[in-house]
Amino acid sequence: MRRRTTTQTDKTLKRWLVWLIREGNAHVPFDRAVARVPARLRGKISAGLPYSPWMLLEHMRISQWDILDFSRNPGYRQMKWPEAYWPRTEAPPSAAAWTRSIAAFKRDRRAMERLVANPKTDLYATIPWGQGQTILREALLVADHNAYHIGQLIVVRRAIGAWKE
C-alpha cells in the first residue's frame, strides 16, 4: 500500500467530516427527519417523552449555531446552560418559525461544512479562545449531537403519529 501525504490525508479526513456533518451513515438525514411534520403536531409532547418536534428542532439549531460561533468567533460568549439552548415554548409561534428554524439549521450546517473543508483550516490546531478544543473536535461534536437528536426526533414523531417509514 502506498503511503499518503499529510495533505492527502487531511483532504480525505475533511471530505469524510463534511459528509458526516451533512448526512452520516447510520441515521435518517435531517431533511427527512423534519419533512412533512403536520403543523398541529409540531408542539405535541407524547406521554413519557420530554420533547416536542419543535423543541428538538430548535435545540439542534441553537446548539449547532453555538458550536459554529465558538469555532470561528474570537469574541465568542458562552450561553447559559441549559435554558439558552432550548426554546421557551413547546410549539413554534408560527408555521414560518418552523420553516425559518429549518433554513437556519441548514445555513449553519453549510457554514460548518465550509469551515471544515477550507484548505486553510487546521483541524488539529487548538482554538485560541477555547480550552483545548480543535475544529476536528467541534466538527465531530456537531455530527454526533445532530445524529443523537435526529434519532430523538424520529422517536417523538413515531410516538405522536407523525412518522411513516
Explain the meaning of each model-derived region.
Residues 88-126, 137-142:
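Acidic/histidine-rich alpha-helical segments that form the ligand environment
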Residues 1-10, 14-27, 31-34, 39-87, ...:
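Short, contiguous alpha-helical
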